[in-house]
Amino acid sequence: MLLRMSTLLLRTLREDPADAEVPSHRLLLRAGYLRRAAPGGYTWLPLGKLVLDRVAEVIRTEMLAIGDQEVHFPALLPAEPYRTSGRWTEYGDDLITLVDRRGAEHLLAPTHEEPAALLVKELFTSYRDFPVGIFQIQTKFRDEARPRAGLLRGREFLMKDAYSFDLDEAGLQAAYDRHRSAYQKIFARLGLDYAVVHAVSGAMGGSASEEFLATSKIGEDVYVGCTACDHTANTEAVTTLAPPASNPEERPATQVHDTPDTPTIASLVGLANARALAGRDDWAAGDTLKNVVLTIRPPGAAKSELLVIGLPGDREVDLKRVAATLAPATVTVFDGWADHPELVRGYLGPQVMAKLGVRYLVDPRVVPGTAWLTGANEPGRHATNVVCGRDFLPDGTIEAAEVRPGDPCPACRTGQLTLRRGIEIGHIFQLGRRYTDAFTVDVLGPEGQSVRPTMGCYGIGVSRAVAVIAEQHHDERGLVWPTEVAPCDVHLVAAGRGPQVETALGLGNRLAEAGLRVLVDDRGHVSAGVKFTDAELVGIPRTVVVGRRLADGYAEVRDRPSGKRADVRVDALVEHLVNEVHSG
């Protein structure tokens, strides 16, 4: 393959686009890989399409290697299967829906579990047909409220999704392990630094799931590691170690105190110590019980319901953790104080939740026998020694508090948690029988009995992976593509006119005939300096400069990742580059 920049659909930019927030977005636009077509939608230009196709081919190769077969489902699907599974409402506002001229409702599919289950139901009737593994690389859609960060958070994106069907849990586990191993090979080939972390299943359903998170300072996901063991988890999936419970009746009696002008935890702790409430002057924020009011709207519900969460006052509520726990319900911060005078803002306590009929969930650290300084449900008043199990009975526990560095590891219980940011590039799930139950997918077992297959699903964001590679492989001058996914193997720069251009084109043709992918900068209207700047911005791994040393029979080979340069004889250049590319 030979591309000439004099005719290539490519325009580089000298300045960062104003709306580009993250490095990958800035560089992919500046280097001419993408153009914004709409909010959350991008046109792939030739170099970008080459990278996208190469990433997809790496994924396709590894999926075929584990025995999955490639299919292609429609992107436009009828609503009914998604109503049957419940996801028509569970996906909420993220689902893009439409009505055709006949009045029938459709959706632009975000994932394809439903059609995959229906396909297996239609094709297979016997246990002899299993296991089954299928995958597709398909455009998906999500109605993002605020598309941002270029390819990392768009409304339209390319995704690989695979589905496994097995007759029992052992088969599902084997399929899950195969795909997990394949993902590790894929991300290694793509040159990505990543972590595999425990995750929640969310609207997908099922039991076990893991995310593959590419390490990145701009990542929206936060995950934990442990200083003493190999435990990793998305913070949404972190469990809190609870202290031992004790006898609530052994605690002192509750006392109510006047605490004017203390609507915040800091002001309350300051007053409590100044006045030595309950005979103490060592109160800390962690001794207080903060009560946070949220609104919850289950899928398809006509109205929201109130939820109050009690947690130690030194912790903030992490709404992402709450949303993950309560999915698929929509969670928002309560702002209807004027309509609920029974909820005393700033002085809310747990003692009245049952009387008010408000659902009350607490942090796992709030166990029977723990005593708290908390609101007395009267303006300007708080109570000490409000004891869980005596003065209030929660409706349950919830993982809602922020996770902090130094928190105890829930796996080994000896190490401390560390926090890092990452970008989700893959997610694998053990779905179980949620979808085969929904569509009554049954086959004949070996003893003539009815057997219901169990499913797994395995997703990779293909277009997102392009952006993530760009995030991890760039420098101050531009992109630095790994060889496996670079749009071309060699970038030939004719640093002059006449013989330099002719030699560069001749070398390009010979390299293309040898099986390499070549980009030749044969533009006659730009300076050598601009060509060198563009070569670094575009980020092809090897640049060959045909310039002033051509008269001596030499060209300069520049290695983009390391910056090393070497003069190579022109008559040996093709063999040199072919060997270099093929050796890795």
UniProtKB/Swiss-Prot annotation:
Homology family: Belongs to the class-II aminoacyl-tRNA synthetase family. ProS type 1 subfamily.
Keyword annotations: Aminoacyl-tRNA synthetase, ATP-binding, Cytoplasm, Ligase, Nucleotide-binding, Protein biosynthesis
NCBIfam families recorded: PRK09194.1 (NF006625), proS_fam_II (TIGR00409)
Gene that this sequence comes from: proS
Intrachain S-S bonds: none
Protein name, UniProt field: Proline--tRNA ligase
One GO CC term, this protein: cytosol
Enzyme class (EC, first level): ligase
HAMAP family with a match to the protein in the record: Pro_tRNA_synth_type1
Reaction equation(s) it catalyzes: tRNA(Pro) + L-proline + ATP = L-prolyl-tRNA(Pro) + AMP + diphosphate
Entry text on domains: Consists of three domains: the N-terminal catalytic domain, the editing domain and the C-terminal anticodon-binding domain.
GO BP, sorted A to Z: prolyl-tRNA aminoacylation
Lineage: Bacteria, Bacillati, Actinomycetota, Actinomycetes, Micromonosporales
PROSITE patterns on file: AA_TRNA_LIGASE_II (PS50862)
Annotated stretches, region: Disordered: 242-261
Keyword Mitochondrion: no
Complex and partners: Homodimer.
Gene Ontology MF terms in the entry: aminoacyl-tRNA deacylase activity; ATP binding; proline-tRNA ligase activity
Stated role: Catalyzes the attachment of proline to tRNA(Pro) in a two-step reaction: proline is first activated by ATP to form Pro-AMP and then transferred to the acceptor end of tRNA(Pro). As ProRS can inadvertently accommodate and process non-cognate amino acids such as alanine and cysteine, to avoid such errors it has two additional distinct editing activities against alanine. One activity is designated as 'pretransfer' editing and involves the tRNA(Pro)-independent hydrolysis of activated Ala-AMP.
